[in-house]
Amino acid sequence: MSATARQTAPMPVDIKSRKGGEPIVSLTAYTTPMAQMMDAHCDIVLVGDSLGMVLHGLPSTLEVTMEMMILHGRAVSRGLSRAMMVIDMPFGSYEQSPEQAFESAARLMRETGAGAVKLEGGQHMAQTIEFLVQRGIPVMAHIGLTPQSINTLGGYKVQGRGPQAEVLMQDAKAVAAAGAFSVVLEKTPQGLSDEITASIDIPTIGIGASAGCDGQILVVDDMLGLFTAFKAKFVKRYAELGDLGAAAIAAYAADVRARRFPAPEHVFADAEPKANTKR
């Protein structure tokens, strides 16, 4: 087992208790094999609505549906035994009212086995977060760049510079006070991210924020080089699996066209092989 491997699955209360301690490791997953690969090394595996873009070729996360989240959530759940699974609430499934949010969150958790839900928004979503937590649904909050709000934010811009910094600080304090067990800070300035981390009593999970956050998360297809439509500044590529995969497919195509594949070791003889009678 790798030196980074863990032994037991954390609960939301365990994640919250990690505030100021060992950094929390998080990645997104959308399939069973990928979940199995990261299970021993991640504290949190997020079934992110980013699946709409990286798996389904959609232009944004806005087109992602509950049915898509449930399908992929079930797949990821089957691949996990150690990491805690958190699932994104898709656009339109929680914004209308706390009651709508509860119905959607309960369905997501019931049908996927997720340990918590993640929703976007700060002060304006605090009432909804509190409503969910009071009814037994753990919530990971998400502030800063919130991809479901790109049409009102004006695109994928850094959030929290200038006067907006105080707004984000108040967002963080509001979701913490409402009962969120952690909060994602996306594409927020380093200094502000550190100030928020020091100002609230729940872990901050950074993505394009600061190494000083209580944990980090990346989209797995970004860090493995599988999603190549664009590369965000905050992404570190730990592998170039897209290039490796393309090269492997090209080699396979060449072998098929040259009749090198299947080779003798890949096919079956007409007669049954003789049993080995040697003792």
UniProtKB/Swiss-Prot annotation:
Which Gene3D superfamilies does UniProt cross-reference here? Phosphoenolpyruvate-binding domains
* Entries under InterPro entries matching the protein: Pantoate_hydroxy_MeTrfase, Pyrv/PenolPyrv_kinase-like_dom, Pyrv_kinase-like_dom_sf
Where located? Cytoplasm
Predominant location category: cytoplasm
Q: Which reaction does it catalyse?
A: 3-methyl-2-oxobutanoate + (6R)-5,10-methylene-5,6,7,8-tetrahydrofolate + H2O = 2-dehydropantoate + (6S)-5,6,7,8-tetrahydrofolate
Query: Which cofactor does this sequence's record say it needs?
Result: Mg(2+)
This protein's GO CC annotations: cytoplasm
- Name the pathway: Cofactor biosynthesis; (R)-pantothenate biosynthesis; (R)-pantoate from 3-methyl-2-oxobutanoate: step 1/2
Look up keyword Transferase and say if it applies.
yes
The EC number(s) this enzyme carries: 2.1.2.11
Q: Where does Mg(2+) bind?
A: D49, D88, E120
Q: Does the keyword Disulfide bond apply?
A: no
Q: Which GO terms describe its biological process?
A: pantothenate biosynthetic process
Checking CDD domains in the record gives: KPHMT-like
The first-level EC class reads transferase
GO MF assignments: 3-methyl-2-oxobutanoate hydroxymethyltransferase activity; magnesium ion binding
**Binding positions for 3-methyl-2-oxobutanoate per the UniProt entry:** D49, S50, D88, K118
Q: Report the superkingdom from the record.
A: Bacteria
Q: How is the cofactor bound?
A: Binds 1 Mg(2+) ion per subunit.
Catalytic center residues:
E186
Against HAMAP family, the record matches this protein to: PanB
**Subunit architecture:** Homodecamer; pentamer of dimers.
Entry's family note: Belongs to the PanB family.
Q: What is this protein called?
A: 3-methyl-2-oxobutanoate hydroxymethyltransferase
Record organism: Roseobacter denitrificans (strain ATCC 33942 / OCh 114) (Erythrobacter sp. (strain OCh 114))
Lineage, highest ranks first: Bacteria, Pseudomonadati, Pseudomonadota, Alphaproteobacteria, Rhodobacterales
Q: Which gene encodes it?
A: panB
